[in-house]
Amino acid sequence: FSKTNRPVSGATHDKELPVGKHPIQVYSTATPNGVKVTIMLEELLELGITAAEYDAWLIRIGEGDQFGSGFVKVNPNSKIPAMVDHAPSGEDNGGPLCVFESGSILLYLAEKFGALIPTNIRDRTECINWVMWQMCSGPFVGGGFGHFYAYAPTKMEYPINRYTMETKRQLDVLDKHLANKTYMVGE
């Protein structure tokens, strides 16, 4: 990624994003954050919510697709996943709605379709707590460990050991929470 990452934001080249036949357009790749959106959309479809049909487009992050002008219009942070909903629900008549960051997309889809998120305040808050925990812990652990273990130009013992320990700690949090329950929230 050393050839694509840089210290400033914005597009590096002109390239519009493709648009398919469904209102929901997903722009992503098969990373841990990237697959969250398609997993949720597939779960919504499995529930019989046909309005969750979508088109998925590959963003080749190693080649810098996320820095194309079309992608930057959807997500100014140039990170996957990103989504455009050409038919937002409710009173919104402002045209297509851009949604970025996997957690934000998951919450948007849950709200839009009224599914896969609890409706009572206690369970809903606990659900959002765990979504935020994963959003904050997962990239720190996976991204930090993965970078220093697999991608850093020089292997450094301290960061590898530090992220290994933190990965184990985060998994222990998860194991303890699930020790006597089947699901993160509710049953």
Question: How should these model regions be labeled?
Answer:
Residues 166-169, 173-177:
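Solvent-exposed, charged/polar functional surfaces in cytosolic regulatory/catalytic domains
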Residues 1-168:
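GST-like domain detector, emphasizing the conserved glutathione-binding G-site
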